[in-house]
Amino acid sequence: MSNAPEIVQRLIKMIMRAFYETRHIIFMDAILRHSALTDEQTALLMGIPIKECRFIAGKLREDRLLAIQSRTEMKEGQQRQYHTTYFYIDFCSTIDSIKWRMHQLVKTVEDRMRNDFDSKGYVCPFCNKKFSSLDVLSLVTNEGTFACNVCGTELKDDEESAEMMSSQKRLGKLMGQVNGIIDALKRVDEIVVPQNNFQSALEHAVPVSLDTQNLSQQNLSKSNSDVRLSTSSPSITVDFSADKETDEKRERNCDKQVKAAQNILPEWHATSTISGSITRAGAKDAALHSFRTETVNEVQDTKTDITSEKSALDAYYATLRAKQKEESEFMDSENVDDEEDDDFLDVTTATSLQNKSTDYGSVKRKTENLNSDSDIQNKRTKSIEENNSLPPIVSTNGITDGDTEMQESKKNVIINGFNEDDEDDEDEADFEDV
């Protein structure tokens, strides 16, 4: 337990609960109980990371409520030295800091109240007219007072102004809240506060129990695991339990039906008690009920269609697989037959040889016919050219009629492109073809 007097510990607790957050309150309570703690022990007791613990300690040290000391220590089973940070409270410094802050707080409120009092102005007690501090400068009388410019009555200070009333109310509220702290400071001034440096804090330090330390470690590990789970990347899981989903859907449908039955309007709301006809609310409820029924039926029909399509696809793929299997077996059997046929050699028969010789003879005759036709055509072309090279026939009186007829007959023969030699050649060519 700390060596500080009870009134000092009470003062520190009052200050922490009046002006600080919950985590700062827990931190200072732990230091007051154990007198001195390391950063690791404090983090374990509070169940927070060491980094956050040091951040809290830095804030309290800035306000001069906490003292921090670092030193090198040797841990058990290790030869390397480590820097260890200790937290403790220097009571004299803490009390002085509290006094100074309370003085600054009260002074700030009083200064604001004084400013409001200086600017409160003046008021006429007869006509209740108010004047500011600048307006009354032109209303000075020979006696050195201020007179009203309306009725001439002497002006008085406005003690009931809104600013003055709010300032007095603010100061009274503050003094009521800090009255306990001021009383504690007065009682602390009546006693002698012992010095609490780092050595004395270590001498009066209360060790952390193993049960508390183990419990804090479990809480810290649990909090860290929760943080890791909350900050981990999202994962996707696929659940193939179709039966479970079916049961859940069935339960949801049952719940919907029960809720729909509960939400049905009473009979005296749905139908008129006088005429017995359906009211507007009843018609609306009936339309909504029919819409829900149609929606459920459509969903069921859709599920049935999907099931039938799935069964048809399964049957189609089964037939396709059977057909592919039969085709593969048939191809295997054909490959076996081809391998057996390859074992035998092809034999050339006499008939095939005779057919080949016949084909060769027919090709030879066709070639000869083409050659003879080309010779005949050449002869015709040659005769036409010779005919064109002859000199023109000039008719004279000394030529007889018989000569004229002979020349005309030759001309006709040449023009037609035929002569007796050509006809004989054609007959011979026909004979050769036969």
From Swiss-Prot:
Pfam families: TFIIE_alpha. Keywords: Metal-binding, Nucleus, Transcription, Transcription regulation, Zinc, Zinc-finger. Residues 8-99 form the HTH TFE/IIEalpha-type domain. One of its GO terms (cellular component) is nucleus. Residues 419-434 have a biased composition (Acidic residues). It is found in: Nucleus. Residues 226-238, 386-399 have a biased composition (Polar residues). A zinc finger (C4-type) spans 124-151. One of its GO terms (biological process) is transcription initiation at RNA polymerase II promoter. Gene3D superfamilies: Zinc/RING finger domain, C3HC4 (zinc finger). It comes from the Eukaryota. One of its GO terms (molecular function) is RNA polymerase II general transcription initiation factor activity. Residues 241-251, 376-385 have a biased composition (Basic and acidic residues). InterPro entries: TFE (IPR039997), TFIIE/TFIIEa_HTH (IPR017919), TFIIE_asu (IPR002853), TFIIEa/SarR/Rpc3_HTH_dom (IPR024550), Znf_RING/FYVE/PHD (IPR013083). Residues 217-251, 357-408, 415-434 are annotated as: Disordered. Recruits TFIIH to the initiation complex and stimulates the RNA polymerase II C-terminal domain kinase and DNA-dependent ATPase activities of TFIIH. Both TFIIH and TFIIE are required for promoter clearance by RNA polymerase. TFIIE is a tetramer of two alpha (tfa1) and two beta (tfa2) subunits. Belongs to the TFIIE alpha subunit family. This is Transcription initiation factor IIE subunit alpha. It comes from Schizosaccharomyces pombe (strain 972 / ATCC 24843). The gene is tfa1.
